[in-house]
Amino acid sequence: MSQTHRILLLNGPNLNMLGAREPKHYGSISLTSIEEKIQTLATQHNVKVECFQANSEEKLINKIHESFQQVDFILINPAAYTHTSVALRDALLAVSIPFVEIHLSNVHKREPFRHHSYFSDVAEGVICGLGAKGYEFAFLFAMDYLAKK
């Protein structure tokens, strides 16, 4: 890659509690550990990654808006907002930044209300059920996607 690409890693509500929160579904790794792994990959690929987590829909939307023409790709785990937030979906569509939707657990093996996503049909891809590795796979996909641009 001739230029340094910029990636935004967004994590939604309650993901700051990873490691302690329902390890049966989400694993025992912390969000900090996931972010550190992505930063290591970013260094290896000469890419800048900004990590941001919020429990507030407003803060996530504002971060997406701030990314307009500043970020080349978004990796997002919308968490519970996956199933409820038209506003986050609209923010992503407004900035026209390609993104991958990530979920630690396999949402299709869980409660029926978790089966619907407001993001999947407008995402470049969706990764779910692969635990923390899903973030790494999403990052590598973003690298491939950006290399082809």
UniProtKB/Swiss-Prot annotation:
Pfam families: DHquinase_II. Substrate binds at residues 77, 83, 90, 104-105, 114. CDD domains: DHQase_II. It comes from the Bacteria. GO terms for molecular function: 3-dehydroquinate dehydratase activity. It catalyses: 3-dehydroquinate = 3-dehydroshikimate + H2O. Keywords: Amino-acid biosynthesis, Aromatic amino acid biosynthesis, Lyase. One of its GO terms (biological process) is aromatic amino acid family biosynthetic process. Disulfide bonds: none annotated. PROSITE patterns: DEHYDROQUINASE_II (PS01029). InterPro entries: DHquinase_II, DHquinase_II_CS, DHquinase_II_sf. Its EC number is 4.2.1.10. The active site is at 26 (proton acceptor), 103 (proton donor). Pathway: Metabolic intermediate biosynthesis; chorismate biosynthesis; chorismate from D-erythrose 4-phosphate and phosphoenolpyruvate: step 3/7. The record marks 21 as: Transition state stabilizer. Catalyzes a trans-dehydration via an enolate intermediate. Belongs to the type-II 3-dehydroquinase family. Homododecamer. This is 3-dehydroquinate dehydratase. The gene is aroQ.
